[in-house]
A protein has these predicted regions:
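Bacterial Sec-dependent N-terminal signal peptides
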Residues: 1-26
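A Zn2+-metalloprotease active-site environment signal
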Residues: 19-499
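Start-of-domain marker
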Residues: 33-40, 69-70, 499-549
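Active-site-proximal beta-strand/loop segments in catalytic clefts of secreted hydrolases
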Residues: 100-102, 119-120, 199, 514-517, ...
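Short, solvent-exposed beta-strand-terminating loops
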Residues: 145-150, 333-340, 558-564, 618-631
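Short helix/strand-bridging catalytic loops that position acidic/His residues to coordinate divalent metals
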Residues: 157-169, 527-531, 633-635, 641-643, ...
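C-terminal/domain-edge helix-coil "capping" segments
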Residues: 174, 478, 483-523, 601, ...
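N-terminal segment of the mature soluble domain
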Residues: 524-617, 665-669, 673-675
Length: 701
């Protein structure tokens, strides 16, 4: 008896150990893969491109670090698949389900049996049975051999969006997948048929936020300041009924036809005893919330700050004191302020006229604010988050960066921010016993510094607007005053400090070299050759390593060896890729990157906190040919110049853009940066020369 108990105890312990850790929103962090690296993914990553088994989309997603495996979410999906394939042992061996890290609502079936369910789908479905239908549909695509995996038409933009555009199934294939999925796989499960309306609604409105909640003015205003009424819409655009929309305008076409046919297929099938949930409903709700947090994190990486702000606002209605949401909101407002300051308004949000529903109020408000209002509102958000988490180094660095933007770059002064609520009169201040004496004008930087340390409160001014009242509750904070003083004083010494910092940095003995992103496009905006781009990136990385070695600095390259993959290495690789995406989406902005802290562990492990990253785009310039310059000189020498004329006319310049950046991955600061953009014929040589020169300049300092 005792032996039996010991065996059962041991088996229970082994089972518990084998289970992935439970995902939680209380201490949410970017989701990492768990367990052993899956053999199907290893096989896919190492399949030769010449093979019929090669899966370009899967390999692309894997090498971008977008695949998640081995987590509690994956196990939840596997349990559903097990029920769908209970009578199909062969398919049980062939189907492998993974999660694709993107907020886009979709799922994909690939020819090798891989099924990818997006994080966006997990965030939007309303019950487990809806997920079962989605998986049954994708498995049917595979069993009916509908799958195709072709990235030859890849264009600029998010690779998942491109794949969705290029890989749409025909109407007949979609209908077949619904029929086979329902009658061959879904029918064998205990899941309810009543969910069909729900899942087709999820697909029909897949571009909408997690929920529709009015965006209240109190979200961006307080009792002591108010924006003008014209910063807000009186009514927002209603979300129209999409059931009669033209299919080509929808992300998921044929929805209404599919809905009608699917409901017809199961109309006469018994539904008694079938359920929306087979696994615990509480687990589904928790995992869906985790998926929503993960989508918000991806919005931040993509710099889709309007989506990040609104969806964070939605989630805060349920989790009002969540540390991650508080930080995410601060990050989103900060990122929006940095883009606004650089004039890149359209890069971080959709035009409000293109937005439907309650989110339109937010986008309209973001459209109305000026750069000072953006910066100060962002500072308010960051300061609030910092009060709750005072040891958060990222928030500290972001707050200091915003203070520098406000008081140095935007040239606002400490006395530009009132200590009294908007609308307070001098009479009210006097009646309350306050001092209504105005300080003398500050004519020098020393006067400004002294005024910032004065105990006298800043009084209302007829010229003040809402922005001048936005720091009432922060203005007298001793830490805030100290950071403002530091920003003002340091601005006067910036050149000296920069030199000192460069000297210190120049003494680094090692540097991380991220694999460059090198993208070459043809005249139609399509990627010419991923293989050529990879080769160019590898050659550029080798050149960067040589430049560092010349100065006895050890280059540390970090890439993923998929021939011997390990999960810990893959998770670090994912973090690096997320940072790459964050950097690229910033468009060259000097800002504290949301993903910088992801690299802290990598920096500690590899022994360097400096990271050099290069992003290159190479596109044909349709408007410029070198022949325009040379032909007038060559025509008089015709016909002797004919070979030269033909050669010159065959040359076509390319528009080359190079972003060069050296980042301190611990505090997120940019140590060196450069941007190169011009029309070139011999562009590869110029790119290599520019990057080599920038590294030389950096290390010689």
């Amino acid at each position: 008896m005792k032996k039996t108990i010991l065996i059962l105890t041991a088996l229970f312990a082994l089972t518990a150990f084998a289970q992935p850790p439970q995902l939680s929103i209380e201490n949410f962090a970017p989701i990492e893969s768990q367990g052993a690296f899956p053999a199907p993914l290893k096989r896919a990553a190492n399949t030769p491109k010449s093979s019929k088994e090669y899966s370009p989309f899967l390999v692309s997603m894997l090498k971008q670090g977008r695949i998640i495996y081995g987590t509690e979410m994956n196990e939840y999906l596997d349990n559903i698949v097990e029920k769908l394939l209970v009578n199909h042992p062969q398919l049980q061996q062939e189907i492998h389900v993974y999660i694709l890290q993107t907020p886009i609502v979709n799922a994909f079936s690939l020819p090798d049996g891989t099924v990818l369910v997006t994080m966006g789908m997990l965030a939007q479905v309303t019950n487990e049975a809806e997920l079962a239908f989605v998986l049954a549909h994708e498995i049917a695509h595979y069993s009916e051999r509908h799958g195709k995996d072709d990235d030859s038409k890849a264009k600029k933009g998010d690779v998942v969006s491109r794949y969705m555009r290029n890989q749409k199934y025909s109407r007949e294939q979609e209908f077949t997948a619904d029929r086979v999925g329902l009658l061959t796989f879904y029918k064998d499960t205990p899941y309810s048929y009543d969910i069909l309306d729900g899942i087709f609604d999820v697909l029909l409105y897949s571009d909408l936020p997690f929920d529709e909640i009015p965006f209240q003015r109190s979200e961006v205003e307080t009792d002591f300041y108010h924006f003008p009424d014209n910063y807000f819409l009186k009514t927002v655009a209603n979300i129209p009924d999409r059931s009669n929309m033209i299919d080509t305008l929808l992300t998921h076409p044929n929805i209404e036809k599919r809905r009608t046919l699917a409901k017809g297929l199961v109309r006469n099938l018994p539904n008694d005893g079938r359920k929306e949930f087979v696994q615990p409903q509480e687990q589904f709700t928790r995992l869906r919330n985790v998926a929503r947090f993960a989508c918000i994190d991806r919005f931040l990486i993509n710099h889709d700050y309007d989506l990040a702000i609104y969806n964070t606002y939605v989630m805060e209605q349920t989790f009002p004191n969540n540390a991650y949401l508080r930080r995410a909101k601060a990050t989103a407002y900060y990122g929006a302020a940095k883009h606004k300051a650089s004039g890149q308004t359209t890069t971080f949000m959709e035009p409000y006229r293109d937005v439907e529903g309650e989110q339109q109020q937010l986008n309209y408000f973001l459209t109305k604010m000026n750069r000072n209002e953006y910066a100060v509102l962002a500072l308010r958000r960051v300061w609030t988050a910092l009060q709750a988490d005072p040891k958060d180094e990222y928030l500290q660095n972001v707050a200091k960066d915003l203070i520098n933007d406000i008081f140095v770059k935007n040239k606002m002064k400490f006395i530009d921010f009132c200590d009294y609520s908007q609308g307070t009169t001098m009479e009210e201040i006097a009646q309350a016993g306050g001092d209504t004496t105005r300080p003398a004008a500050a004519n020098s930087k020393y006067d400004r510094i002294k005024q910032q340390n004065m105990s006298a409160k800043v009084l209302p001014d007829p010229k003040f607007k809402a922005v001048n009242y936005m720091l009432v509750d922060i203005h007298s904070d001793s830490l805030f005053k100290a950071w403002v003083n530091d920003a003002v004083v340091n601005a006067e010494m910036q050149a000296v400090l920069s030199y000192v910092q460069d000297k210190k940095i120049g003494n680094e003995t090692s540097m991380l070299i991220a694999t460059p992103i090198y993208l070459t496009y043809n005249k139609n905006g399509q990627i010419k050759s991923l293989a050529d781009d990879k080769r160019n990136a590898e050659q550029l990385q080798k050149l960067m390593c040589r430049a560092l070695k010349r100065h006895k600095i050890t280059p540390i390259t970090f890439d993923m060896d998929f021939s011997k993959p390990e999960t810990d290495t893959y998770n670090n690789f994912v973090k690096m890729r997320q940072w790459n995406a964050d950097f690229t989406n910033a468009g060259g902005l000097d800002m504290r990157y949301h993903t910088s802290e992801y690299l802290d562990d990598i920096a500690a492990e590899l022994g360097s906190r400096k990271l050099c990253f290069v992003h290159v785009t190479d596109s044909p310039d349709r408007a410029y040919f070198p022949s325009k310059i040379f032909l007038p000189w060559l025509i008089p020498m015709f016909p002797y110049s004919l070979p030269v004329v033909v050669g010159v006319m065959s040359l076509r310049t390319h528009e080359v853009d190079v972003d060069f950046r050296i980042i301190d991955v611990v505090d997120g600061t940019t140590e060196a940066s450069g941007h190169y953009s011009r029309q070139e014929v011999m562009r590869k040589a110029y790119v290599n020369g520019y990057v080599y020169q920038r590294l030389e300049q950096y290390v010689r300092k």
